[in-house]
């Protein structure tokens, strides 16, 4: 894993240099958009504290690790599973290598407990994190290998399994972006999300799942309505869920050609990601793209796209970096008119 990390760190620096150069080529002198200063101020205040938020997260992780190391000999296997799950959750959107490590630990502990619920929960986490790192085949292989006995599993375990599996197919469709496979991946993702609905009790999650299905069916207005309901009902202290809802609202508004609303939600999502020390995210890249293509703000766009590259390289997000690589010719053609 470390060799892969070094390779992608080098890729990050090379891409950063190229993209900065491209962004400044042929810069036009368009007027700043109406609320530019408000966007810049919100982002600047958050970015100034970015290192502080990361240190706070690492301190929290250290406290969990210290607790585990101090008490591990007198813990039950179920207690060990829970603490390792807490560490997995802390790293899930912060560092791929560390999250992968704790996912494998969960699988090991689950095999000792010898419980189908614990094993499904552990393998679901492993499959999910493999996709976050861009290892889609390995993710699908892992999730497909899970034996589901609906009558023997708790509702939460079943819901997490179907939602995670569905999200992997949706992410693969977004990464593939073609006219042949993407539609099939989206269909499979929707089928899995639909399977989760009978096991959900939280109204916000129900709205999120239904909204995601509507989005993948290109029912944008319906998706927007459902995501707004999910936002109104969600626990705002759950930074991961909040980021998903905000960034998806931005994406929906972008596709509805409501640029100002899209930027509004991308800013809220990006600030939330910074405050929660989230490295695996699309909000910063989405904001940079909106500012560059729709507001012609090269300066802010270049700053935020570099933040996105830095986070992707830190996390080890292979598919995010690959997507950025495919965008480079687009930037070149746009700026040089070729």
Predicted regions mapped to residue ranges:
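N-terminal secretory signal peptides that target proteins for export/translocation
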Residues: 1-7
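A "functional boundary" signal
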Residues: 9, 24-336
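Bacterial N-terminal signal peptides
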Residues: 14-22
């Amino acid at each position: 894993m470390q060799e892969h990390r070094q390779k992608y760190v080098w890729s990050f620096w090379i891409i950063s240099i190229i993209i900065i150069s491209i962004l400044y080529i042929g810069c036009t002198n368009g007027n700043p958009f109406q609320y530019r200063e408000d966007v810049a101020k919100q982002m600047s205040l958050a970015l100034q504290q970015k290192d502080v938020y990361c240190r706070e997260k690492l301190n929290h992780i250290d406290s969990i690790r210290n607790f585990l190391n101090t008490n591990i000999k007198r813990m039950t296997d179920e207690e060990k599973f829970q603490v390792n799950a807490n560490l997995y959750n802390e790293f899930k959107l912060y560092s791929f290598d560390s999250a992968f490590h704790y996912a494998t630990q969960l699988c090991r502990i689950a095999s000792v407990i010898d419980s189908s619920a614990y094993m499904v929960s552990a393998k679901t986490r492993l499959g999910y994190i493999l996709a976050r790192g861009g290892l889609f085949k390995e993710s699908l292989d892992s999730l497909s290998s899970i034996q589901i006995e609906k009558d023997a599993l708790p509702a939460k375990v079943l819901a997490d399994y179907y939602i995670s599996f569905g999200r992997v197919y949706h992410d693969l469709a977004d990464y593939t972006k073609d006219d042949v496979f993407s539609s099939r991946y989206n269909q499979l993702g929707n089928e899995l999300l639909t399977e989760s609905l009978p096991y959900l009790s939280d109204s916000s999650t129900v709205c999120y799942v239904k909204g995601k299905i509507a989005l993948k069916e290109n029912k944008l207005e319906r998706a927007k309505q459902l995501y707004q309901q999910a936002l109104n009902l969600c626990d705002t202290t759950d930074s991961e869920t909040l980021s998903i809802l905000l960034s998806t609202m931005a994406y929906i508004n972008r596709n509805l050609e409501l640029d100002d609303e899209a930027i509004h939600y991308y800013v809220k999502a990006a600030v939330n990601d910074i405050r929660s020390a989230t490295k695996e995210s699309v909000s910063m890249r989405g904001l940079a793209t909106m500012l560059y293509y729709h507001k012609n703000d090269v300066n802010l766009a270049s700053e935020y796209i570099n933040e996105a590259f830095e986070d992707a390289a830190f996390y080890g997000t292979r598919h995010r970096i690959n997507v950025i690589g495919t965008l480079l010719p687009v930037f070149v053609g746009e700026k040089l008119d070729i």
